[in-house]
């Protein structure tokens, strides 16, 4: 009953961004790291973050970034090849598996995603930023830009399913577009795979539709 209020607000819990309680986001330092292409990349300095070299030794974030920058050309020659690989769930999985074997697994890439303030973006944006200093695009903006091309040619039922998949992608990330996730997505939307097959025209059409739309999601026009 007093003004200003003196009520105990209780613990606020750790910050969703920095993971600290109280939040230390404003205290974070930004590091500018010049890579071998002569361009700078900006990352957040996160004291609690540890990176490791291929031989298991602790390294700095700068060393990690330099090493990743030097390694990525082994997997794709240019931005267009990265885009082509990433736009197909089969080749994307192969790339992610190879990166993981080289010491750049999803955990490391997700940490780097936080450090470049791209948590609402795609892992594609992380690789593109490191390789070509391209500005990350939010998943929502990517979807909005590509919607017209994605839905062109789909019937109403297919439109509804892909719209559902895209909503999951915006909420969670690129892992929702993995082929392994397709059965779960169908069950979430239609309760059973049999019902999904009946509504959407069969297993093969579902698979083709799920793979085909991703090409438009990652096309240059959508970036």
PLM region spans:
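Catalytic cores and motor modules of nucleic-acid processing enzymes
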Residues: 8-223
